């Protein structure tokens, strides 16, 4: 009887481990995006589970106006497939104020095929895209990332700035500063926050002298 019970509990533990080891789709993430405190658009990420893979669909829309005229328009659509924590495929299209950009990545047996506006190559390196939702991005002090707009490379240095309470002391986060340079030579300086579950919670960066701030729609009072 004791032997049968032991076997039963071993099987139960193995089955539980098997279920827990499968990838689970993260919670959807939605940001309102502000430029110098004025709302200019959104950045939404939705996730779904497909067998053991995770599908991430990312949509970004910015529109800056002046005296009623649109002076800057940006749209980005990106679909990523992840398997066992590794990027499997990525396909993005970007309209950057009239400039069309693209990036496509597919996992081969022992490398990645990369085809984008900036380059076409094979790479054996693990790819971390600049979609920011995976906190693998901030692990370590340096990280080579793939710009999801055009498949160029951004080398980031990463500084941990410690724990911070955000959204009126409602969310405890870890705060990081990323510094890098785009292929155009433009500096990239980002402040980014992840909550204690590793979920992307907030972001601020400077673009063309303006402060761009991402605020979670869940905590944005302007949505009330």
Predicted feature locations:
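Bacterial N-terminal signal peptides
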Residues: 7-16
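Acidic/charged, solvent-exposed loop-and-adjacent secondary-structure segments enriched in E/D, K/R, S/T
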Residues: 111-128
């Amino acid at each position: 009887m004791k032997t049968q019970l032991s076997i039963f509990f071993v099987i139960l533990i193995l089955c539980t481990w098997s279920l827990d080891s499968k990838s689970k789709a993260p919670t959807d993430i939605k940001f309102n995006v502000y430029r110098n405190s004025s709302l200019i658009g959104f950045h939404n990420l939705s996730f779904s589970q497909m067998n053991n893979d995770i599908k991430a669909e990312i949509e970004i829309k910015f529109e800056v106006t002046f005296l009623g005229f649109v002076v800057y328009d940006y749209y980005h659509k990106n679909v990523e497939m992840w398997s066992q924590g590794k990027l499997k495929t990525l396909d993005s299209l970007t309209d950057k104020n009239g400039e069309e950009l693209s990036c496509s990545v597919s996992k081969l047996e022992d490398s990645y095929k990369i085809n984008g506006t900036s380059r076409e190559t094979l790479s054996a390196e693990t790819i971390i895209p600049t979609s920011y939702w995976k906190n693998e991005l901030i692990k370590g002090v340096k990280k080579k990332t793939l710009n999801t707009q055009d498949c160029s490379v951004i080398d980031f240095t990463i500084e941990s700035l410690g724990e911070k309470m955000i959204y009126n002391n409602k969310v405890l986060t870890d705060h990081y500063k990323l510094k890098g340079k785009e292929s155009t030579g433009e500096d990239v300086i980002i402040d980014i926050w992840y909550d204690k579950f590793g979920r992307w919670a907030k972001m601020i960066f400077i673009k063309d002298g303006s402060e761009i701030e991402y605020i979670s729609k869940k905590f944005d009072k302007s949505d009330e």
